[in-house]
C-alpha cells in the first residue's frame, strides 16, 4: 500500500496473507479475504502458477509471531475459467482457495461480509485498501499490515480517456486515483467499503498502472466482487 498508515493490529480480521514455499521458508506474495471458515477469496493471478501455498490468518507483522496467527495449508485452488494470465485487463481475476482446516473465529479472525449480487458502488464511496504490499513503486513490502483511504471511482469516470479508458471493464471496481494506492504484494486482498455503516469487501485487488502504483488518474483496479457472487456460491 502506497500512502495511508499501519493498521491497528487485527482491525481487518478477514485479511489473510497468502504465502508460497521456497526452500524451507514461506514468503508473502498476495493478500486475500476469509469468506467462509474453510474458504479464502483472492486474485487468480496470485495462484495461477503451481506452488505450495499456505494462508496465515490473524496476521499483523509478517516477521513476528504475535500469538493470534492461524496457519492453514491450501487443499485446492479454484481459478475462474474466464481468467487468462496473458490478459489481466480481460477480467475474471478471482480465485477461491479451499483450506485444509476450518478457521477458528475470534477477535482477530472473522469472516468478510460480501455485497449483494451485482451491487454497484456510487462514485466516492468510502473504502479502504489493506495489505502488506510495497509502500512505494519498486520499494519494499510492508512488515505490518497497512490501510489507505481509497474512495471508489465510478465506471464512467474510470473508463474515460485520460483515466483507464477501455482497460477497465464493468466487472471491475476502481478506487483512488490520487497519492494513495495498492501496489505489488497487495493483489488478491480486499477493498473494504463502507455501506450503511458496515464494511463489505467490494473488490479483490487486481492491477495498477505500469507507470507507477499511484500514477495520477490511474486508480487501483479491483475485481468487482458483486459480479461473482453466484460463481462463488456455485463452488463453495
Swiss-Prot record:
Record's catalysed reaction(s): Hydrolysis of proteins, including elastin. Preferential cleavage: Ala-|-Xaa
Domain of life where this protein originates: Eukaryota
Binding residues annotated for Ca(2+), in chain numbering: 59, 61, 64, 66, 69
Short name of one Pfam family: Trypsin
Enzyme Commission code(s) on record: 3.4.21.36
Domain Peptidase S1, first and last residues per copy: 1-236
Family: Belongs to the peptidase S1 family. Elastase subfamily.
Protein name (record): Elastase-1
Taxonomic placement: Eukaryota, Metazoa, Chordata, Craniata, Vertebrata
Amino acid at each position: 500500500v502506497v500512502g495511508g498508515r499501519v493498521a491497528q493490529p487485527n482491525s481487518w480480521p478477514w485479511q489473510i496473507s497468502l504465502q508460497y514455499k521456497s526452500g524451507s521458508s514461506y514468503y508473502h506474495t498476495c493478500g486475500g479475504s476469509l469468506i467462509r471458515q474453510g474458504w479464502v477469496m483472492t486474485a487468480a493471478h496470485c495462484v495461477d502458477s503451481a506452488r505450495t501455498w499456505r494462508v496465515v490468518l490473524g496476521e499483523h507483522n509478517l516477521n513476528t509471531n504475535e500469538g493470534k496467527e492461524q496457519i492453514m495449508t491450501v487443499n485446492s485452488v479454484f481459478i475462474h475459467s474466464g481468467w487468462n494470465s496473458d490478459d489481466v485487463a480481460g477480467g475474471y481475476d478471482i480465485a477461491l482457495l479451499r483450506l485444509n482446516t476450518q478457521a477458528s473465529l475470534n477477535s482477530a479472525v472473522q469472516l468478510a461480509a460480501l455485497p449483494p449480487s451485482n451491487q454497484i458502488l456510487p462514485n466516492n464511496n468510502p473504502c479502504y485498501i489493506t495489505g502488506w504490499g510495497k509502500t512505494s513503486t519498486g520499494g519494499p513490502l510492508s512488515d505490518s499490515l497497512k490501510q489507505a483511504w481509497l474512495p471508489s471511482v465510478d465506471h464512467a469516470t474510470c473508463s474515460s480517456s485520460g483515466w483507464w479508458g477501455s482497460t477497465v471493464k464493468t466487472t471491475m471496481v476502481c478506487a483512488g486515483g490520487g497519492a494513495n494506492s495498492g501496489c505489488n504484494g497487495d493483489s488478491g486482498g480486499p477493498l473494504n467499503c463502507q455501506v450503511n455503516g458496515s464494511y463489505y469487501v467490494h473488490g479483490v485487488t487486481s492491477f495498477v498502472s505500469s507507470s507507477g502504483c499511484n500514477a495520477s488518474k490511474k486508480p487501483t483496479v479491483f475485481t468487482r466482487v458483486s459480479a461473482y457472487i453466484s460463481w462463488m456460491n456455485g463452488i463453495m
